[in-house]
Structures are given as C-alpha cells and as structure tokens.
Amino acid sequence: MTCREKILSNDYADLITDYVVAEELSGTSPIDFCFHGIDDGYGVANVRRSMFPPMSIGYYGYSAIPVLYGLMQTGEIVFDPENLAQTGSIRVQNPPLSLQGAGVVLGFIDTGIRYELDVFRREDGSSRIMALWDQTIQDGEPPDGFLYGTEYTRAQIDRALQTEEPTLLVPSADTNGHGTQMASVAAGSILDQGLTFRGAAPQTDIAVVKLKPAKQYLRDYYLVADGVPAYQENDVMEAVRYL
C-alpha cells in the first residue's frame, strides 16, 4: 500500500509522535508503517493495527492517540443584520474606518464550503476563495508537501464557476453545511447593499480545508455514535500547517 492509502485506511492507526519514535519504528522489522512530519518536532505515523495492541492510553500514551472533534452547532442559520450590528462590525465597515478585510486571508478548517454561492464571490462573479484543500477527494493532486486529498486553486474554481455545472470541474461540496455557514458569517460578501447578506469581513480572501471524517476505529474507541460528525486531531494539525 502507498502512504496515501495507509493514511486513509481503517486498517492503519494514526499516531501523533516525534521523530525519535519514527526512527525506532524504521529500525524495527517488519513494522508496516508510514511517517510524515507536521512540524520540526512532531508528525504522524500510520501503523498497521493488526501488528499492535488495541488503542489504550496505557500502551500508546495520551498524546499519541488523536483526539476527535465534533461540530458546535448544526442546522440552518437565518441571516439577521441586527446580530451583525450588535457586534460592531457594520460600524467599522463603514467610513471613516472602512475596515472590510482587504489584504487579509481568513482560513477555515471545517466541513467544506459551497464555493459557488454568491457570498463567496466578488462583484464580477470571480471567487474570493484562493485555495481549497479537500481531504476527502483522492483522485486529484494534494497540496505540495502533503500526501492525501486534492487541492483546488482559485483559477480552477473560477473556471468551474463559468460553467453551468461547476461541481463537474471542482467536485468539492459541503454536504453538512456547517463550514459554509461559518465562512459566510465571518467572510460573506455584501449582497444587495447588506440587505440580503453581509459577513463580518466581506473583502477578505478565503482559504478552506475540508476535513476527512474520522476513521471508524477511533470512533469506536471514543464511543462516537453513528451519524455524528467527527474529525481527527492529526487531520486538523495538517490543515493548520496547510493554512
């Protein structure tokens, strides 16, 4: 199996570890694993589960087993400009400050984004999304320095938006809706002079990581119920490195 396949396979456990442990694994035959670094101190080892004991803090240590993260809020959010006004955002967006996020990049690590929506476009219809890394799509090229998922550039997204069916060219989708809602609240464009929609920073560029779902063995370990979204700590760490 390739390292990409091991990263994705439920037959391989993901362990957050340092380079010393990775070197020890390399010197142990016949351990079946891959290791890829996240920063100067830590990385992720993907080891065949059948060659190691079941998940336990006693054996692996607390920090090695990825924590799982869920969503704080689900369901449709109705736009209400009064809520935005209470934060003070509209006041600083208007003169004399005119602070709308120009020159800033906002990054979102979540369930993805519905990139085709008007709230993520400029007035000319082009995308405000400068990069989108979808960890769940494996038939494209991952970002430079990463081993899984597919990266879509602004140019690719803009080409897709010029077609009748954008998802044929950029098939990334936010089926949950949580990531789209968070990005729109923070960075949604001003539509109809703010009557239809207005985000807190409507002129920022946007970068997005769509997290892949947690592996089943970790869901079982943490007793996460079926159907409840859950995402792995190491995938979040990779997303932070990307952004």
Residues covered by each model-derived region:
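Autoinhibitory propeptides
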Residues: M1-V105, T111-R128
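Subtilisin-like serine protease catalytic core
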Residues: N94-D235
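Structured alpha-helical segments in the cores of large, soluble enzyme domains
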Residues: V236-L243
